[in-house]
Amino acid sequence: MKGEYEAVARAGVDLQIDCPDLGMGRHIQFADLSLDEFRKMARLHIEALNHALANVPPERSRLHVCWGNYEGPHHHDVALGDIIDVLFTARPSGLSVEASNPRHAHEWRLFERVKLPPGKVLIPGVLDSTTNFIEHPDLVAERIGRYANLVGRENVVAGTDCGFGTWVGQAAVDPDIAWAKLASMAEGARRATREFF
């Protein structure tokens, strides 16, 4: 994919690399490994990714860590705190993480003790992409604010937990609801901007 990644960047488009292997891979593909063995595997995957992105400017790319975009228990998900140091070694400057679903919504507190490396931008999911609830703009602003207070307002970009149509024929969120959720995110971001800028 190295050539394709470079072509995308040359065309002036920012590149997002989706990496379910670094999140969901823990409980789907690598469940038999110890945490240390999984971290070693994750480091190997990031090493390969960094090679593929060697000629793509870090600020033109972001890494999305996905724990599986499905409505399920997620009680075997690897904790963000168990892999954050490994994720920070990835070349992309943007790091997109699930931060709204009930299994990962608490992980913003990780950044009370973990510092975002210079040059990195955090893209927390402020919308749960698996439910038809439309988040209130004030909740979106609150979620953005939690991260802005911890990593700096200039280092936060609002995102969604994942995409709204991950698998063909298995749309958990009605398309009209997805658009309404995105409108709520835009309004919540405006409110957070007024508060922090």
Please describe what each predicted stretch is:
Residues 1-197:
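Domain-level signal for soluble alpha/beta catalytic cores
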